[in-house]
From Swiss-Prot:
Cited function: Condensation of UDP-2,3-diacylglucosamine and 2,3-diacylglucosamine-1-phosphate to form lipid A disaccharide, a precursor of lipid A, a phosphorylated glycolipid that anchors the lipopolysaccharide to the outer membrane of the cell.
Listed GO MF terms: lipid-A-disaccharide synthase activity; phospholipid binding
Protein name per the record: Lipid-A-disaccharide synthase
Classification via HAMAP family: LpxB
EC category: transferase
Species, as recorded: Nitrosococcus oceani (strain ATCC 19707 / BCRC 17464 / JCM 30415 / NCIMB 11848 / C-107)
Length: 387
């Protein structure tokens, strides 16, 4: 007998999307326990009960050149999802971020008459704003996590709902600073610096050697500083091993506990991405670094219309955290900025005050709201579909 329980197709293509989608799934199951999920999933979504059709970690690439080298993987994932939509005809398709892939899939879902909920908007406010109208043709509801995104969709007649930011609920640690430092076997009387090279293999290759060289420079000036490196769920310790050889830093690699690591840190150096907002919500001062293929970077410069690259700075509307981009993200500059931050308590406190203002801007949190929106769409409620 065929299963009549609602079926949701879901896609997340990044580590952060995997995390947000997993929380969404668990919250939906609290409201409607029978709902089934299948799609492109990472480890956290699989743990939440998604039937995985493709491993999202194989899609976690950034930049034009990097994407071109993974086209076979991306094409294979798209074919699997299209086949799933055509064969199973799910009651709802939820797309989490990952716009280049997801908007193409949304177009296919539209032709099949499948409702589409897009959770975490493409950054239309930063570049290619014309996409708002294209999105309106293939998406039934846009659930945004930043309040300033709402007008972009309202003006284009696209149904939009500000659900709050998922990180408001997700970013927390049970430890205070000293407890976290002791938890990881370090001395709470010494400063601790977090090194966060990113969650993608391409980021590790590009950023980890630079971070380690910067840490060695810092260590030569301040040998009492301790180092923590949280390992993303998309990576394994063996992925880092070749880069760590030859370094004698007081460094610990900590898998799957990024927020506890942040709680232990007096400051961090982090790759640009979701982690910069996580740091802001944890109140951890940081230096942001960004390096990618030169061609990808310069093409991005021509298209992107924002003054900052770090999400925490974009939301704040100012450069709260220093950004070191491309050639400026050198071991020398990173070491200098990190040392200045570690040595200047007043500067760290000012940054923390501005981070608190960011936290206030983001609302109460998204988990329950996005889950209720999902269930409402499954139940066929009229949510104001634009004509």
């Amino acid at each position: 007998m065929e299963n009549s329980a609602p079926l949701v197709a879901i896609v997340a293509g990044e580590a952060s999307g995997d995390q947000h989608a997993a929380h969404l799934i668990r919250e939906v199951k609290k409201i409607a326990p029978g709902v089934r999920f299948g799609g492109i999933a990472g480890p956290q979504m699989r743990a939440a009960g998604v039937e995985p059709l493709f491993d999202s970690s194989r899609l976690a690439v950034v930049g034009l050149v990097e994407v071109l080298s993974h086209l076979n993987e991306i094409y294979g994932a798209m074919q699997k999802m299209r086949h799933f939509l055509e064969e199973k005809h799910p009651d709802l398709l939820i797309l989490v971020d990952y716009p280049e892939f997801n908007l193409r899939l949304a177009k296919r879902a539209k032709t099949l008459g499948i409702k589409v909920l897009y959770y975490i908007s493409p950054q239309v406010w930063a570049w290619r704003q014309y996409r708002v109208h294209q999105i309106g043709q293939v998406v039934d509801m846009m659930a945004v996590v930043l309040p300033f995104e709402v007008p972009f969709y309202e003006q284009a007649g696209v149904p939009v709902n500000f659900v709050g930011h998922p990180l408001q609920h997700e970013v927390k640690s049970k430890f205070n600073r000293n407890e976290a430092v002791v938890e990881f076997g370090f001395n709470p009387c010494c400063k601790t610096l977090g090194l966060l090279p990113g969650s993608r293999h391409s980021e590790i290759k590009r950023l980890l050697p630079v971070l380690l060289e910067a840490a060695e420079r810092i260590y030569s000036e301040e040998p009492e500083i301790q180092y923590l490196l949280p390992l993303a769920a998309t990576l394994k310790e063996i992925d880092l091993a070749p880069y760590l050889k030859g370094y004698r830093l007081p460094l610990r690699v900590i898998p799957d506990r990024s927020y506890d690591v942040m709680a232990a840190c007096d400051a961090m150096v982090a790759a640009s991405g979701t982690v910069t907002l996580e740091a802001a919500l944890m109140g951890v001062p940081l230096v942001v670094i960004y390096k990618m293929n030169s061609l990808s970077y310069w093409m991005g410069r021509l298209l992107i219309k924002v003054d900052h690259i770090a999400l925490c700075n974009i939301i704040a509307g100012e450069g709260v955290a220093p950004e070191l981009i491309q050639q400026d993200a050198s071991p020398e500059r990173i070491a200098l900025e990190a040392l200045n931050l570690l040595r200047d308590k007043e500067r760290r406190q000012t940054m923390q005050q501005k981070f608190y203002a960011i936290k206030h801007k983001l609302g109460a949190g998204a988990q329950r709201t996005i889950a209720e929106l999902t269930v409402a769409m499954l139940e066929g409620e009229n949510l104001g579909r634009a004509s």
